[in-house]
Regions:
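Short beta-strand-loop/turn "lid" adjacent to the catalytic site in phosphate-handling enzymes
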Residues: 49, 69, 73-106, 132-139, ...
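Active-site core segments that coordinate phosphate-bearing ligands/cofactors
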Residues: 2-7, 13-14, 26, 113, ...
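N-terminal glycine/serine-rich phosphate-binding loop of ATP-dependent small-molecule kinases
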Residues: 1-102, 130, 227-237, 432-434
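Short glycine-rich phosphate-binding loop at a beta-alpha junction
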Residues: 77-86, 157-158, 211, 404-416
Length: 479
């Protein structure tokens, strides 16, 4: 038993990199009672550079530095460790001296259109799924690295996913943590190793890939600049579940395995934790993906549209700012009449920016159903249609999951911003027939902390210890 488990647990810092905002949070303790403070939040987003879409890497690092210095001012006790999680697939390319060769591309950059066609010809989708368990998507790191090759970037240039790169800039060695490595489309589905066959068919340099490490690995001590701050004098750097969805799932305080999760936000990810990947043609054709999870498991889920739909309808129809208040709109939607039918939220046209209210009405027309007037006063009706359609889609996806895995489901946990949408949660419970529990909004921060605490007590990837700390932290966190 470690010393901190016999007395007060340690203070730790979680950095959560988001495509829209980045957060630095501090975990402190009052005896055995945790106190979590969001110390610094900064906006983030891709920046147009000529014909490309990039991330402002230095700006991101500056905001992380500000957050860490504020953490040092907020506590009188040492900070034991720092962990970083964030969005997947994007990365930094490095020269021989370890210096970035430029700001990293955003996954929405159109350069993967050409590389996607090249990969589809060289590496069939069925082969990629069988080898990696991941749905072939053009945003994946695999496609971006091939785009680099087509653009003449030297293949020997090493690369590091963004959360792990930030950890390296804080003093750690350059690594790829398993949950984030899975999103590259280059990790072997069955082993904790890069898949050489996929590197080969894509024409990528295997030696440019970073060292793989398991979830919760200690990758070094903070750099001298941070060590000058007394609170960081002996701080370790830990690779948590570096993919933010994996961290969010790690933050769920669940018992047993008869449960599903929905990571709900701009996108929705309905799925379940499994001990082994599902690599069948049926799973691939149903659109499920196998990603790594903390505790040596797999996140088996499907990408489904989410609150993106409502944001786009608001963008189309909102005239007065008051009509755009999300909380009031959800309440008005609950008072609206039940729609005559639902729309297919994953219809390809609804995945792109545009006049989504018009596109949803087109779907209603195709079903012979009444359309909704495309005016601001109809926003509650559109919101109700979206929520009803999402709830039905969740029921369909979870039904497919049960059929593919044989998993019995007794409860659903909702994490992310969508957990605050009580009406959508109610509709989801009604559609699935399952009780639903609301997780905390920043579940990725909870999961980040939980993995760090398990690592500090010598059980970095122990499922039971991660789950224990998730329960402790959820007990005092705000939904």
């Amino acid at each position: 038993m470690s010393a901190f488990r016999m007395s007060q647990p340690p203070n730790v810092v979680a950095i959560d990199l988001g495509a829209e905002s980045c957060r630095v949070s501090l975990l402190q303790w009052n005896g055995d009672v945790p106190q979590i403070d969001l110390v610094h939040r900064s906006s983030n987003g891709p920046v147009a550079r000529g014909h490309s879409l990039r991330w402002n890497l230095q700006g991101l690092l500056n905001d992380v530095s500000i957050g860490l210095r504020l953490c040092a001012e907020r506590t009188s006790d040492p900070i034991a460790s720092i962990g970083v999680d964030g969005w997947a697939v994007d990365y930094v390319r490095l020269n021989k001296d370890g210096v970035p060769i430029g700001d990293p591309y955003c996954y929405r950059d159109e350069r993967t259109l050409a590389s996607g066609a090249a990969i589809e010809e060289a590496c069939p989708a069925a082969f990629l799924y069988r080898e990696t368990g991941v749905q072939p998507l053009r945003i994946n790191t695999l496609y971006q690295l091939v785009a680099d090759r087509h653009a003449g970037v030297p293949q020997r240039c090493r690369w590091a996913n963004l959360p792990e790169y930030v950890l390296s800039q804080l003093g750690g060695r350059i690594v790829a943590e398993l949950t984030n490595a899975a999103h590259t489309g280059l990790l072997d589905a069955r082993a904790n190793a890069w898949n050489k066959a996929v590197f080969g068919c894509a024409g990528l340099d295997f030696d440019a890939a970073p060292e793989l490490v398991s979830t919760g690995s200690d990758i070094g001590v903070v750099n001298p600049d941070l060590r000058r701050l007394a609170r960081f004098a002996a701080t370790r750097l830990i690779a948590p579940a570096c993919h933010d969805t994996a961290s969010a799932v790690a933050g769920i305080p669940a018992e047993g395995d008869a449960w599903a999760y929905i990571s709900s936000g701009t996108w929705s990810l309905p799925g379940a934790l499994l001990d082994h990947p599902v690599l069948s043609d049926e799973a691939r054709n149903a659109g499920f993906t196998n990603l790594r999870a903390a505790g040596g498991q797999y996140c088996f889920h499907k990408n489904v549209n989410g609150m993106w739909l409502l944001k786009q309808v608001q963008k189309q129809l909102c005239v007065h700012e008051s009509a755009c208040n999300l909380r009031e709109l959800i309440a008005a939607a609950e008072r609206s009449a039940c729609p005559h039918g639902v729309v297919n939220v994953d219809e390809p046209r609804l995945l792109l920016p545009g006049k989504l209210a018009s596109l949803m009405n087109q779907q209603l027309l195709e079903q012979g159903l009444p359309v909704i007037p495309e005016e601001e006063s109809s926003l509650p009706a559109f919101a109700r249609l979206i929520f009803q359609s999402l709830a039905q889609r969740y029921e369909e996806v979870l039904g497919d999951l049960v059929g593919l895995t044989g998993r019995k489901l007794e409860r659903i946990y909702v994490v992310g911003g969508g957990s605050l949408n009580a009406f959508l949660n109610q509709l989801t419970a009604e559609a699935t027939g399952l009780p639903l529990s609301c997780g905390v909004v920043e579940s990725s921060t909870i999961g980040n902390f939980a993995v760090q605490l398990a690592s500090l007590e010598g059980a970095p990837d122990a499922r039971d210890r991660i789950r224990h700390w998730a329960k402790v932290l959820n007990s005092s966190a705000e939904c």
